[in-house]
Amino acid sequence: MKKTEEKTNAVRLLTQKKLRFQTHDYTESGAVSAVEVAQALGQEPLRMFKTLVTEGRSGAHYVFLVPAQTELDLKKAAAVVGEKSIAMLKSKDLLPLTGYIHGGCSPVGMKKLFPTVIDKSAAQFDTILFSGGRIGLQVETGLD
């Protein structure tokens, strides 16, 4: 990591916990979609995961990491966390709740700890990539 690079909450926490990770900056590429980001970074699109924050009927919040090219099945997700139903968190509520903005939301370093579910497809990879806490930054790390 460059010494001049701004550290996000996610990068700070991973560093503090002494976890092995690598950052990938794609700011200059102009990439937006998961496929574009994967191409800009020379990575497999299936290894790119997006962070989705939801709210259950109970009012509890849940975080899901799903392959970036897929959509979250809200019915199945609700069943996994024991809720009758869940809905995606509104964009306007994301920053106050997590400390991150839409498009730069990392599952690591949120303001509070929320139950987090990672799609089982992640297990097939040695490492996966997800948002590093700002648009243009991905973190690559293992699940162990």
What spans do the regions from the language model cover?
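Extended, low-hydrophobicity, polar/charged segments
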Residues: 1-144
